[in-house]
Design a protein with these regions (language model features):
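Conserved NB-ARC/NACHT P-loop NTPase core of NLR-like innate immune receptors
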Residues: 1-222
Length: 222
């Protein structure tokens, strides 16, 4: 179990997820929390997404008819169209995780959840990982990535922590800005000194925080 507290975290989370999914011996699942989004800021939202990913991972769980029957019967018995019970979500997720030899879970943006949900998410995953250590230490790994707020600091204080400040991101952001200079220069016919100034100024104003560009933003630049 590890927590990473930093600014400009989303790109780092994406890179870690990409690398984890390349590992042949590991089942890597992930979730991006989002502030004030009911579909992405609660334990139930996390559990639903992770269950879906585990079920789709490589067909292993889809071939387990007993497990699928268990999931279906319990959700059907609840009378809800979707998974709404926190207790049932915990039970289903625990059983699903145990079906795999090694699971890596990456949760980005815990700080964007309400305090109650932060507590629920962090405490449950900590308990599950601790349980794995009692039986098979390599069975599960969990990484929390968040801004360094007071709540997460208290909830995850006992975990190994890597702190990344804005100054740690500056060189990467500057390199990214410089990589776009040539394309900007070709489109707007700018002299070399001016386009270099733009790249340096954008990096400076970013303040160490990453900016994710959509496809429309990129097309407007090139």
């Amino acid at each position: 179990m590890l927590t990473v507290r930093l600014v400009g975290k989303t790109i780092l989370a994406s890179l870690l997820i990409e690398e984890a999914r390349k590992l042949q011996s590991v089942t890597a699942v992930f979730f991006y929390c989002k502030y004030h989004d009911p579909q992405r800021d609660s334990f139930l939202a996390v559990a639903r997404s992770l269950l879906w990913q585990l079920l789709r991972h490589d067909g292993k769980l889809q071939q387990d008819n007993d497990l699928l029957a268990f999931f279906y019967e319990n959700v059907a018995a609840s009378g809800d169209e979707s998974l709404q019970s926190i207790k049932l979500a915990k039970d289903m997720l625990t059983i699903a995780i145990q079906k795999f030899d090694k699971v890596y879970i990456i949760l980005d943006g815990l700080d964007e959840c309400p305090v109650k949900e932060k507590k629920l998410i962090s405490s449950w995953f900590c308990d599950v990982v601790d349980g794995c250590y009692d039986t098979e230490a390599e069975a599960m790994r969990c990484l929390f990535i968040s801004q360094d707020d007071n709540d997460c600091g208290k909830l995850l204080g006992r975990l190994p922590t890597v702190k990344v400040s804005s100054s740690d991101n500056n060189s990467d952001i500057l390199a990214f800005c410089h990589s776009w200079e040539k394309q900007i220069q070709l489109k707007f016919y700018l002299p070399e000194p001016e386009v270099q100034f733009i790249g340096t100024e954008v990096a400076k104003r970013a303040g160490g925080k990453d900016t994710v560009l959509g496809e429309e933003d990129k097309s407007n630049m090139v």
